[in-house]
Amino acid sequence: MAGFGLPNFGQITEAFKKAQQIQQDAQKLQEELDDMELEGTNEDGRVTVWLSGNQQPIRVKVENSILKEEEEIVEAAILEAMQKAHEISTSNMKSRMQELTGGLNLNLPGINDDN
């Protein structure tokens, strides 16, 4: 420690280097998440939704057979596939962000939550 209880210049420099590295890693992670295609499929496999790692919709596949069903069944199948894709995508993002910030004890809403 330097005088007056302040950290020495070397510690400050090291902290800035670490912050810059995290920023670079975060930018790389953002690009990786954008390029991912994570899929969620409804229970009977007739509807599939793909999202990016950032929860952006990419595409939807609906089998012809389900279109012969009642409207509520089709809607429920699409919603189920969307929810599964979103769950997979958000879980992946949280995991990747925790890897990035590991050990820093950052309180990031939605990332460090146990919910």
Curated annotation (Swiss-Prot):
GO terms for molecular function: DNA binding. Keywords: Cytoplasm, DNA-binding. GO terms for cellular component: bacterial nucleoid; cytosol. It is found in: Cytoplasm, Nucleoid. InterPro entries: YbaB-like_sf (IPR036894), YbaB/EbfC (IPR004401). Disulfide bonds: none annotated. Its main location: cytoplasm. The keyword Cytoplasm applies. It holds the Pfam family YbaB_DNA_bd. SUPFAM superfamilies: YbaB-like (SSF82607). Belongs to the YbaB/EbfC family. Homodimer. Binds to DNA and alters its conformation. May be involved in regulation of gene expression, nucleoid organization and DNA protection. NCBIfam families: DNA_YbaB_EbfC. This is Nucleoid-associated protein Pro_0020. It comes from Prochlorococcus marinus (strain SARG / CCMP1375 / SS120). The lineage of its organism: Bacteria, Bacillati, Cyanobacteriota, Cyanophyceae, Synechococcales.
